[in-house]
């Protein structure tokens, strides 16, 4: 796998969970001898929702909710076969979305 790169993109609602998963990936990749760049924090996406509390008249009574989506990017440079096998066997938390791209 000479001159290749694995880009791993992580998304989660909980920043502690995503940081823990990123550190597990970094430890696994370094243990197999690959070079890791990251984790690089990307901008947090904040979605806000405003809901009317009153069913009828009171327009002033509202509740606001938000969801924050945290993102991280990791690049694994010059991965070997051991690195790919170790990453495939890695068990990450259920609340983390993982996208892997081989370039």
Curated annotation (Swiss-Prot):
InterPro entries: Ribosomal_uS10, Ribosomal_uS10_CS, Ribosomal_uS10_dom, Ribosomal_uS10_dom_sf. Keywords: Ribonucleoprotein, Ribosomal protein. Gene3D superfamilies: Ribosomal protein S10 domain. PROSITE patterns: RIBOSOMAL_S10. GO terms for cellular component: ribonucleoprotein complex; ribosome. Disulfide bonds: none annotated. GO terms for biological process: translation. GO terms for molecular function: structural constituent of ribosome; tRNA binding. It comes from the Bacteria. Pfam families: Ribosomal_S10. PANTHER family: 30S RIBOSOMAL PROTEIN S10 FAMILY MEMBER (PTHR11700). Belongs to the universal ribosomal protein uS10 family. Involved in the binding of tRNA to the ribosomes. This is Small ribosomal subunit protein uS10. It comes from Stenotrophomonas maltophilia (strain K279a). The gene is rpsJ.
């Amino acid at each position: 796998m000479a001159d290749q790169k694995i880009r791993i993109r992580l998304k989660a609602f909980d920043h502690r969970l995503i940081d823990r998963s990123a550190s597990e990936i970094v430890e696994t990749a370094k243990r197999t001898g690959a070079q890791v760049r990251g984790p690089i924090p990307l901008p947090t996406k904040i979605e806000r929702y405003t809901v009317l509390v009153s069913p009828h008249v009171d327009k002033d009574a509202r509740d606001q909710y938000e969801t924050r989506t945290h993102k991280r990017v990791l690049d694994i440079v010059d991965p070997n076969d051991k690195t790919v096998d170790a990453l495939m066997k890695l068990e990450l938390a259920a609340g983390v979305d993982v996208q892997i791209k081989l370039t």
